[in-house]
Amino acid sequence: MEEVINGILIREVETKNIMTKSSLPVGGYSVNPYVGCTHACKYCYASFMKRFTGHKEEWGTFLDVKHWPEIKNPKKYAGQRVVIGSVTDGYNPQEEQFGNTRKLLEQLIGSDADILICTKSDLVVRDIDLLKKLGRVTVSWSINTLDENFKNDMDSASSIEHRIAAMKQVYEAGIRTVCFVSPVFPGITDFEAIFERVKDQCDLFWLENLNLRGGFKKTIMDYIAGKYPELVPLYDEIYNKHNRSYFEALEVKAEKMAKKYDCAFVDNEMPYGRVPQGHPVIVDYFYHEEIRGTENTGKRNR
C-alpha cells in the first residue's frame, strides 16, 4: 500500500525481524516500528537513513509502516537493553492510526527486557497500561528549549508543554522517566531552566551537545545566521574550528548544578532504578562517542 495522508507519503513494508542489534553507546537492541519520522527535525541525525532505504523524498515527508513476524519468544531478550525509536519516533502522529508501537509493546510483555522509549510526543500516555505490565521501562522525552517558537522552528512534534505534561503523567504512574536535553544549542538552550521545570518528574536528566554534520550542518548554520546572527562567531568556533571550550564549560556548569541540587553526576547512564524525587541523576552525554565502555568511570575514550 502506498498513499499520501496529510501530505505524508505512507508505505507499508514487510521486514523479517523488528529487533536489530544496536551500535548505540547504550547497546542492546534497536527497534524502529517505522522508517522515517514525520517530526522533520532540522537537526535530525537519523536523516542519514535515506542512504540505506533508497528514499528520494525529503526527510520528514515520508513514513514506512513496518510489518514484522510476531515476536514468539520475548524471553530471548531478558536483561537486554531494547531501545525503541533510535532513528524514528514510535509515537509519531501516524501511530494513532497504525498502532505499530503499541503492537510491539504487547509482544514484549514478559520479556524482562530493559526497555528505553525515545520520543517527542505525548501520545505515549495512551500506553501507560502496557508500560506498567512491562516493568523495566524508561521513557525519554527530548526537550532542548522552553521556547515554543524555537521548538516550532526546529520540529513539528508535540509542544514542549505537552511533553512536560506527559512526562509528569508517566512519572506519577510509577514509570522511570528521562528528560533528554538534546541537542543543546550553544547560546540558545538553557538547561538550568529546563531542569527547574522537570526535576520533580524525571529520574534522569541527560545532556547532549548539538552535533552538526552532513547535509543539516548548512541548514542549522543558515538558521543561526538568519535568526541569531550574534551567535555566528560562537558557532563558527565550535563547528568550523572545532573548539570544545564552550561545551567543556557547560560540563563544569552541569556538575555545579548537580552539587547544588544533591544529584548524582555521571558520564553514562546509571543501571535501572529510581531516585528520590527532585534529585534526578544528571548525565554528561556531551561528546557521547567517547563514552562507550567507560562504565561511569569519568575516564572517556579520548
Predicted regions and their residues:
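Conserved Radical SAM active-site core
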Residues: 1-138, 146-149, 160-161, 165, ...
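Auxiliary Fe-S-binding modules of radical SAM enzymes
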Residues: 2-14, 192-302
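Hydrophobic faces of well-ordered beta-strands that scaffold small-molecule active sites
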Residues: 29, 82, 115, 139-141, ...
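Conserved radical SAM core fold
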Residues: 83-92, 122-125, 137-157, 186, ...
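Anion (oxyanion) recognition and catalysis
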Residues: 109, 171-172, 199, 259
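Conserved beta-strand termini and adjacent loop/short-helix elements that scaffold enzyme active sites
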Residues: 120, 142, 266-270
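Glycine-enriched alpha-helix->loop->beta-strand junction motifs that scaffold or abut catalytic
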Residues: 133-139, 199-204
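Conserved strand-turn element in the central/C-terminal portion of the radical SAM core barrel
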Residues: 156, 168-189, 240-244
